[in-house]
Amino acid sequence: MAIERTFSMIKPDATRRNLTGAITAKLEAAGLRVVASKRVWMSLREAEGFYAVHKDRPFFGELTEFMSSGPTIVQVLEGENAIAKNREVMGATNPANADEGTIRKEFALSIGENSVHGSDAPETAAEEIAYWFSGTEIVG
């Protein structure tokens, strides 16, 4: 098994409900270690930059408005197969389809307000980590 890093974000719907600790506890219980973390309130421009891959999708405006509507927690997680493990712990994007015990099944309000974001591949993990963190902010 490979030790890798992934990007994780706790979204505004979850921070508003004080779920940061509960979500982080689920990630840590799955064997993921937080090696960088900060609380940020994205500007609309930052949200548009972070989600630029979706700029031509019909939900882009709603997504970026939501992501800039309150604080988020951006994190770098480390562990064996961290990308796949994080996605497993998060659950399906649509909470109605998420497995019991996953973050989205337990905490998400809707498909849009689904509490967390996580990288889907090593390349996106590297890009998303670099968007929010400098190398000196990541302490393993």
From Swiss-Prot:
Catalytic activity: a 2'-deoxyribonucleoside 5'-diphosphate + ATP = a 2'-deoxyribonucleoside 5'-triphosphate + ADP; a ribonucleoside 5'-diphosphate + ATP = a ribonucleoside 5'-triphosphate + ADP
Cofactor(s) annotated in UniProt: Mg(2+)
Binding residue positions for ATP: K11, F59, R87, T93, R104, N114
GO molecular function: ATP binding; metal ion binding; nucleoside diphosphate kinase activity
EC number(s) on file: 2.7.4.6
GO BP term (any one): CTP biosynthetic process
Keyword vocabulary terms for this entry: ATP-binding, Cytoplasm, Kinase, Magnesium, Metal-binding, Nucleotide metabolism, Nucleotide-binding, Phosphoprotein, Transferase
Assembly behavior: Homotetramer.
Family named by the database record: Belongs to the NDK family.
NCBIfam families assigned to the protein according to its UniProt record, in alphabetical order: PRK00668.1
Protein name, as recorded: Nucleoside diphosphate kinase
Native source organism of the sequence: Brucella anthropi (strain ATCC 49188 / DSM 6882 / CCUG 24695 / JCM 21032 / LMG 3331 / NBRC 15819 / NCTC 12168 / Alc 37)
